[in-house]
Structures are given as structure tokens and as C-alpha cells.
Amino acid sequence: MRMFRESKSEEKKSPSSQTAGLFATVPSLKDIMIDRLIEQLGGIAELNKQVVRDPRLWGAINERLTQHFLLLVVQGKQGQVEAMLKVNPALILFARGDVTDYSGQTFKNISAWEYVLWAYDSHMYRMLFNYIPKEQRPLALQQLIDLETNGIAYTLSEKVMNAEREAEETRETIIREAHYDFSPLIDALQTYVTNVERWSFEECVEHWRKKVGGAQCMVPVHVGNEYCYPDRSFDPIPRFNEKNLPRRHNFYNYVSGADESWFPLSPAGLGTNFAIMRGCMRAVAGACWRVGRQWACNDLAAITALREVRQSDLIQLKEQLQNPAPESAPSTSKTLRSKNP
């Protein structure tokens, strides 16, 4: 449920920014040293282990580890996230930083726990829950309460054309909300279902590609994973209560005639040339210029159901945090029994 939304737009059009950008790409001495350390240790996972062994290193490389960890979280790479947590579970609640997701939304000073709660990514937060020590769960509850009370602000950067200057500019919109809002995608699908049989071919194509596809560009990764769930269509409507969520985002593009990936986004792909549908296709999701009414109805019903299930999941999580079981083990309810696929 979206609680509130504030937005304002800022246009960045500083000619000198191009010159400054040249120097922004030059790594600092600190970054060079950390890169060398990662190379010697054999990867960021080993760096994470070394930090735990020698806490004196934490201050020097905290930012790099946090950035890497948060990026894995927003990209839905659950297996890699869990690998880091097995060594350093403090990353869940206490590591804060700035991170930009696939949609171009930048969250500042956010924890991994706050992000997955905002995104309604129940599969990810179930896994994170299992790594939060019992004595730290009141803090996990407080972060959830703060999120629901105050929301979280993020910045969406978009490229827009300035007609007067005949030049492309970056527009930044600041949005504050408690959770990811399913409404733009649901509304776009509903509008399509309502009008597809009376619109012209061109109107159908325009709305499907730009409105439905545009809304799909903004979904958290787990929503794309549900679209691309292997061997499961949206007809009948899934229950969305599987223990494991395959972190796949591949689909067949009927426009290009090739298998493609939802993420990362392509400027000339989703939201521009096509939108993705699942409908009654069991094997795989598909991308196309337009679909028939029934296919869109299937997707509309499924995404509406997904929103309801994920909202219910979060209510159950909050209840469990507010009323912890006497034993230290997490609840055995279906809501908090997920292991990473």
C-alpha cells in the first residue's frame, strides 16, 4: 500500500558538468588500493571474510563492501547476498549506503533490510530474517515502523528532450513512499483491457509498448522474476506462495526473435519497442508490440493478486517481529520459511 508520495523535478543542465565528468572517472588512490586488495584476495567475497577476521580493516573498506552488498540486494541476486551474510550478517541492518537499481532509482543512506521491505521482496527478506540475531530483531521492527511512518525518499533520473534547446537533459524526480507502488503497472494494464477492442491498431501498440512497458521498467526485480517464473503461466492465477523464487528474468522476444533478459534495461527495448506478457504461456514470458484482451486480462489479474499477497506477507512479518516466539528459531509459517533457490 502506498502511503504518500512527494515529487519535485530538477533539471541538470550545467555545461561545465561534462568537464567535471572527465575527472569523476579517475579512481582515487583509496579505490586503487582497495581494487588491488580485492584482486590479491581473489574477489569481494574474500575481502568480506578478511574484514570479519580483522575489524581494523572495516573503516577503510566499509563503503566498498556496503556498495557491493546493496547492489546485489537491489538486483535480486539472492544467492550472492546470502553468501556475504554467512560471513558478515551485520550487513543486513547496519550497513548503509547509496544504491541505484535497474530502474534508475537512487536510494540514499538505505539499509538492505529497508530496501527489501520497500520493494515487497518477501523472498529476499525471509532469507535476511534468518540471519538477524534475536537481540537485533527489535531494530529490524523499528526500521519497518519508520519506513511505514515516514516512507523513504529516492531519486529517479530520466532523460528528457528539451524542445526549446533541442537537447537532451536529465530530469530528477524525488519521490517519497513507504513501499513500491504496483498501481502504475496495474492501471496501465486495466486501461489496455478496457480500451483494446475499440482502439486502433496504432493506439494499442502505443499504449502497450509505452505505458505497460514503461511501468514494467520500474518494477523491483522480484516482480520480473514472477513474470519469468519457469513453467508457470499467469492462467490460472498463481498463489505466489512458493518457498523459492527462481531469480530468472529471461523471456522470448517475438519482436527480435531472440531470448533476452529483462534486466538490465535497454534504452531501445522494454518501454520503447515492446512490453512483456505472460498470460497463459506456461513455458516462458514473451515480449511483443501488442496482445489480445484476454492475455492482458490474465496479466492484470495476476499482478493484482501478487500485490495483495505481498502486502499480506509484510503484515505477517510485522506481526512476527512484534510478537516473537519464545524460542530463537524463526516462525515455521509459510511466510518465513524460504531458502534461496
Curated annotation (Swiss-Prot):
Name listed for the protein in its UniProt record: Uncharacterized protein CBUA0006
Region named Disordered: 319-341
Keywords, alphabetical: Coiled coil, Plasmid
Polar residues bias: start-end ranges: 319-335
Coiled-coil segments on the chain, per record: 153-179
